[in-house]
Amino acid sequence: MTSVKLDLDAADLRISRGSVPASTQLAEALKAQIIQQRLPRGGRLPSERELIDRSGLSRVTVRAAVGMLQRQGWLVRRQGLGTFVADPVEQELSCGVRTITEVLLSCGVTPQVDVLSHQTGPAPQRISETLGLVEVLCIRRRIRTGDQPLALVTAYLPPGVGPAVEPLLSGSADTETTYAMWERRLGVRIAQATHEIHAAGASPDVADALGLAVGSPVLVVDRTSYTNDGKPLEVVVFHHRPERYQFSVTLPRTLPGSGAGIIEKRDFA
């Protein structure tokens, strides 16, 4: 099978003189081709020689740009075959509730976590109605691979979880999750979770956390987790960079029980 390759004649790889290193400019130009799907996932990057001829840059500069994108997770090197656009992280919803950390580790990706903020305060109305709480502990964490952000994760928790939450606030605890807090440290089993998925424009704080322009499209997932008796435990909101993360679900034609499966909501306003 012939792999898809970037059309260099149509690609904008112009490099300008200025304070931004040429390698960074080339890396950003190639990244733009990936985001715009002119070079789709699984597509092969042009050869080093082709990139040199097209960009007018040196071999060292081209290698630095490609290496930068490899470290950020945009490209993967396959021995004897070339360099290819990396597949996005895929979360299969029909195989049970998994944390983003579990999904990434299953894909061979070791996440890094930045704790951006944590504070107790008034719950937003929707969160208050869901959890039945006036105040919540809000924890904002950024998930990344290398220096490339994947998702902004905002967890709304009961303020009385106490010391059990401390590992979540440690920047070195990259594999810590709210589920680990509930199940391992508090002995509360997660029975099920609802996922509401929609697209939105990045707000200023989301854009800043994910390295995007304000208003850029992001994939938003609202996850509400419940105990066996149907009590809501937490609400976690994920803002994903859409080119780096995707969801997949396999369903039978019919599902037993009310509320089972996927419910489509349309807003034509």
UniProtKB/Swiss-Prot annotation:
Task: Please report the name of this protein according to its UniProt entry.
Answer: HTH-type transcriptional regulator Rv0792c
Q: Which conditions up-regulate this protein?
A: Binds to its own promoter and probably autoregulates its expression.
For this protein, the record's InterPro entries field holds: Bact_HTH_transcr_reg, Chorismate_lyase_/UTRA_dom_sf, Tscrpt_reg_HTH_GntR, UTRA, WH-like_DNA-bd_sf, WH_DNA-bd_sf
* Activity modulation notes: DNA-binding activity is increased in the presence of L-arabinose and inhibited by the small molecule I-OMe-Tyrphostin.
Q: Gene3D superfamilies per the record?
A: Chorismate lyase-like, Winged helix-like DNA-binding domain superfamily/Winged helix DNA-binding domain
Which spans are transmembrane here? none
* Domain comment quoted from the record: The N-terminal domain binds DNA and the C-terminal region plays a pivotal role in dimer formation.
Q: How does it assemble?
A: Homodimer.
Looking at the UniProt feature table, which residue ranges are given for the DNA-binding region?
48-67
Tell me which UniProt keywords the record has, alphabetically.
DNA-binding, Stress response, Transcription, Transcription regulation, Virulence
Q: Which Pfam families match?
A: GntR, UTRA
Where's the HTH gntR-type domain?
20-88
Q: Name one GO molecular function term.
A: DNA binding
Q: What lineage, starting at the top, does this entry show?
A: Bacteria, Bacillati, Actinomycetota, Actinomycetes, Mycobacteriales
Knockout phenotype, as recorded, reads: Deletion mutant is compromised for survival upon exposure to oxidative stress and infection in guinea pigs. Deletion of the gene does not affect colony morphology, growth pattern, biofilm formation and sensitivity to isoniazid, rifampicin, levofloxacin and ethambutol. About 200 genes are differentially expressed in the mutant strain in comparison to the wild-type strain.
